[in-house]
């Protein structure tokens, strides 16, 4: 996500010449992943296990898929409410960074169904990973490193 965010930053800076907005776009494009902490804690508690955290399959342990920031609805709300000419560089750059993040996640995670990145869908399914992903969820084996 850092690479795609960097691409958006370059385009944003080229268009607006606004360094703070370019930096915000870069950070938004990959810091959205902090919401994986919610899923990790739900699955494993507060004790950090790097192998489990980095495998990013927390829904297999908890049976839940939260990812509260990975949401097309939140992106649309941001785009609709963050208006004004002074905010335009932020609005466009951040929106594009998050949108590319969500699209990349959708494409690189084939188990994720088209509605997975809609928060309303996850809420309607009560965050039940098996229903959201449409596959049985079981505890995966950790690979030894």
Segments from the language model and where they lie:
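N-terminal membrane-targeting hydrophobic helices
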Residues: 1-145
């Amino acid at each position: 996500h850092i690479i795609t965010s960097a691409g958006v930053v370059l385009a944003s800076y080229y268009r607006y010449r606004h360094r703070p907005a370019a930096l915000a776009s870069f950070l938004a494009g990959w810091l959205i992943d902090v919401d994986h902490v919610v899923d990790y804690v739900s699955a494993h508690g507060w004790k950090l296990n790097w192998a489990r955290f980095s495998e990013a399959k927390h829904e297999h342990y908890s049976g839940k898929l939260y990812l509260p920031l990975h949401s097309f609805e939140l992106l649309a709300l941001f785009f609709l409410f963050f208006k004004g000419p002074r905010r335009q560089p932020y609005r466009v750059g951040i929106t594009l960074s998050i949108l590319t993040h969500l699209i990349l996640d959708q494409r690189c995670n084939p188990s994720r169904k088209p509605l997975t990145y809609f928060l309303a869908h996850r809420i309607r399914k009560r965050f039940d990973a098996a229903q959201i992903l449409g596959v049985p969820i079981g505890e995966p084996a950790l690979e030894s490193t």
